[in-house]
From Swiss-Prot:
Molecular-function GO term, any one: translation initiation factor binding
GO biological process: formation of cytoplasmic translation initiation complex
One Gene Ontology CC term in the entry: eukaryotic 43S preinitiation complex
Major location (coarse): cytoplasm
Identification of the protein by name: Eukaryotic translation initiation factor 3 subunit B
Subunit structure as annotated in this protein's UniProt entry: Component of the eukaryotic translation initiation factor 3 (eIF-3) complex.
Organism, as annotated: Pyricularia oryzae (strain 70-15 / ATCC MYA-4617 / FGSC 8958) (Rice blast fungus)
SUPFAM superfamilies: DPP6 N-terminal domain-like (SSF82171), RNA-binding domain, RBD (SSF54928)
Assigned keywords, A-Z: Cytoplasm, Initiation factor, Protein biosynthesis, Repeat, RNA-binding, WD repeat
InterPro entries, A to Z: EIF3B, eIF3B_RRM, Nucleotide-bd_a/b_plait_sf, RBD_domain_sf, RRM_dom, TIF_beta_prop-like, WD40/YVTN_repeat-like_dom_sf
Amino acid sequence: MAPSYEHLREADLDEDEFDEDEVDVSDLREKFEVQLEQGFDTFVVIDGLPEVTEEQKPKLVKFLLKKLTSVGKTKEDMIDMPMGPDGKSLRFAFVEYSSPGEAAAAVRQLDRVPLDKKHTLRVNKLMDVDRFGREGRIDDEYQPPHIDEFHPRDHLRSFMADPSGRGRDQFVMFRGDHVGVFWNNEKDTPENIVDRPNWTESFVQWSPLGTYLLSMHMQGVQLWGGPKWDRLGRFPHPFVNMAAFSPQENYLVTWSNRPISIPDEGHPALSMDDDGKNYVIWDIATGKPLRSFANLDLPPDDPNKPPRKHPWPAFKWSSDDKYVARLTQGQSISVYELPRMNLLDKTTIKVEGVQDFEWAPSRPQRDGVKTYEQMFCYWTPEIGSNPAKVGLMSIPSKEVVRSLNLFSVSDVKLHWQSEGAYLCVKVDRHSKSKKSQATTLEIFRVKEKGVPVEVVDTIKDTVINFAWEPKGDRFLIITTVTPTGEVAVQPKTAISFFCPEKSKGSTVGNFKHLRTLDKRNSNAIYWSPKGRFVVVATVHNQNSSDLDFFDLDFEGEKPEGEKDLTANLQLMNTADHYGITDVEWDPSGRFVATWASAWKHTMENGYHMYDFKGEQLREEAVEKFKQLQWRPRPPTLLAKEEQKQIRKNLREYSRVFEQEDAERIAGADQEVVDNRRRILEDWYEWRESVDVEVDEESAAMGVSSNPAEELLKAKTAEILASGQEEEQVIEEIVEEVLEESEEIVS
């Protein structure tokens, strides 16, 4: 029965005995408290200041002002430093900024910043001090903070020590709902290390040095690693879509197409400053967010082109993690310093019309430059009568060290060589009538004095792919003829190889065309991470799935016309993998994995494994196979001299490795033989035990253990007694000549 007033006692209805003060509603008041605008959101409180007298106070204020103005606008008269009754400062100050955003930036960028060797700033919002420091929220008695017991962490680079001693590499596979990490066993079944269902909700990703495995979830991103595959970090970003590491694994960027919405009860990691943002940059070591950003407005769509998407990655890193930059297309490039995430020199780099930029993948060591620098390249289109331009900018000086004017430009792509020694600018040019198009390759020699630019032959066809040799100076392009209209069959492609001429001394010669292989369907280039070997493939194509394995340092005879070039090209092998969508080399450059992903199609999903020569080692069809990714290796710890010594003695090491491989294979074969022999011996023992049991049962029943033998003896005796001859079996063998041939051997 539902309660009603009739069920209440008279005493319960006596209003005189009801006292409102006895009802504690503090929890409800705190939960549903409305934050009224009090006008203090532009103020911050700075603790940790040195104690000064009234005479010393102006000097401290001026010194402090230099740091305060690095994040926003404030003045001396907007800094209030209270003094005690003894005439000395109380070691804190109130600072007013011109906007709430600047106050938030001060908290984010100046908190824990050293003022000098003995003093470190602690910066908080005045509103936060009032909110968290009000009566009842702080205990009168000091309670020491709880410090968790220290537990040593497993070595995060343990994967470098292969327990078999064979130097195998690991890879991760995502199939169905399962994610597993495996040791590569060449022709044999991969050795499973860990396999977990529902480990990720969308995809997995290795960090650049192989330390972490990233998994994606609706609530955010998680990192895993170590020999026990423990969770090493959580980065809560609701509805996250993408994530990317910095090159040295110090930072992580997460992005969601949905703006962050901070609930009234707060968020475990994000603050109200992050509300409405799409990108978050995290410090991996602490798990704390450094700064968040909103999506930039996209330029208006061209009605003749598909809708624009937000660029990814939107934040690009310098090779040493000291800087991260973001492009505002058509306007500027913003460079931020890590870990404070403050804008370099407090200003963006204004570049009118800028379309794209790329950091050098390694620290460039330009000739004659001894100071520290990082470098990025950028390009701008033709604007009015001004030509298109490609520029190289040094950071942190922001000096443009080289620029190049370009004319009749349709599009530009920027391609850095892995060590930052070369930059290839692929320029698509149009004729005056804009009816025909050609491509030129402008190569910047970054490490040479003055950064000279070399123009490679003009290419009449459209270049659809370009790739530098890692740690080398050779490159490939794939070209095709652009069809004038819709065609039923895609036009054929051509593969062109380029390399430098031989030259005296340490200088690299001019780049020359080595060879072109036409009438192909190839559309993708995959260099070995060690250089020399390259796979040219046809991916995402229903009609073709070719794989061509090339060696650019073939040790055989070199064609006469190529003897002055630094390459000897040889096609080692060809293969075919139907439905292929992806190709990836292992970090050692010994093996190549290809796979057909269920994310692209559902036909014959699975993977193939090849060696660097193109010999297929393994093929496995896997239902709902989605992803395979090799685990990267960190750079070697060996000095250059030690590496040279190893290369010098490589033949001796090879003999040892070949002997170990032969013994391992022989051992595996012997193990199979021993196992079969053991099974056969077990069967013989079982049969013998059965015979013994039958004999014992027959003796107990008074029956012969072999009645067939007894019957045969009785029948033979009966035949002999009747005078008949013993039965005999006669076999007749007939041979027939089917074909006869005669061969004369000289």
